[in-house]
From Swiss-Prot:
Gene symbol of the encoding locus: Mmp7
Gene source species: Mus musculus (Mouse)
Family as reported in the entry's similarity comment: Belongs to the peptidase M10A family.
Reactions listed under catalytic activity: Cleavage of 14-Ala-|-Leu-15 and 16-Tyr-|-Leu-17 in B chain of insulin. No action on collagen types I, II, IV, V. Cleaves gelatin chain alpha2(I) > alpha1(I)
Residue sites binding Zn(2+) 2 per the record: C87, H214, H218, H224
Entry cofactors: Ca(2+); Zn(2+)
CDD domains per record: ZnMc_MMP (cd04278)
Protein name, UniProt field: Matrilysin
């Protein structure tokens, strides 16, 4: 099967940039080059027809997703959105399921943590992973079981640069992590960039609990939401409180896939 990858990312390396055009608006040539790569990555086709769009149409798709006037022109504010750390899946409206709605069919999904960050004690990473998975399992008839060796449905780890899955990390900033849709092999696995500064709720660095909860949403089969403030919103904010929870939109999406958990 074809694997679907999702990741937190800020900017992508530029290539094949077009000459500065009218659509560039009030931005520099370098920013226009960055914007082209961003649009090709996150808005490659029309959300309804699935046809490949021009860059102008891609930009309008982005503006529509974020509730902005669909001018088809860049602005400093749009560039600001593009430069926020985020997950690397193309954007869609409200909650969305991945193509073909992949999901886990067993009621017990195993996970294994194979590598750690030096920023947090291992026991803290273990606790955060457990807490992030529990946020989802509290809403659906699915349970997670940790294994210490051998194979597991979801392999979780921290890695640098090229780490064997054809999606290398890029050092501090930009890409923060990525996860694969449910399935065999790499399916469901969640990787985090070891070069980031991972924290347990500090102001600086990346809040690992929030990032893990977001990525595990992808590991379960969710795509992105256009609703600001949701866990599955594509851009990463640094002001999430430690007592955040899944929103109604997040819950609606995951229950669309798995149904509601019986609390009786």
């Amino acid at each position: 099967m074809q694997l679907t990858l999702f990741c937190f990312v800020c900017l992508l390396p530029g290539h094949l940039a077009l000459p500065l055009s009218q659509e560039a608006g009030d931005v520099s040539a370098h920013q226009w080059e960055q914007a082209q790569n961003y649009l090709r990555k996150f808005y490659p086709h029309d959300s309804k027809t699935k046809k490949v769009n021009s860059l102008v149409d891609n930009l309008k798709e982005m503006q529509k997703f974020f509730g902005l006037p669909m001018t088809g022109k860049l602005s400093p504010y749009i560039m600001e959105i593009m430069q926020k750390p985020r997950c690397g899946v193309p954007d869609v409206a409200e909650y969305s399921l991945m193509p073909n709605s992949p999901k886990w069919h067993s009621r017990i999904v195993t996970y294994r943590i194979v590598s750690y960050t030096s920023d947090l004690p291992r026991i803290v990473v273990d606790q955060i992973v457990k807490k992030a998975l529990r946020m989802w399992s509290m809403q659906i008839p699915l349970n997670f079981k940790r294994v210490s060796w051998g194979t597991a449905d979801i392999i979780i780890g921290f890695a640098r640069r090229d780490h064997g899955d054809s999606f290398p990390f890029d050092g501090p900033g930009n890409t923060l992590g990525h996860a694969f849709a449910p399935g065999p092999g790499l399916g469901g696995d969640a990787h985090f960039d070891k070069d980031e500064y991972w924290t347990d709720g500090e102001d600086a660095g990346v809040n690992f609990l929030f990032a893990a909860t977001h990525e595990f949403g992808h590991s379960l089969g969710l795509s992105h939401s256009s609703v600001p403030g949701t866990v599955m919103y594509p851009t990463y904010q640094r002001d999430y409180s430690e007592d955040f929870s899944l929103t109604k939109d997040d819950i609606a999406g995951i229950q669309k896939l798995y149904g509601k958990r019986n609390t009786l």
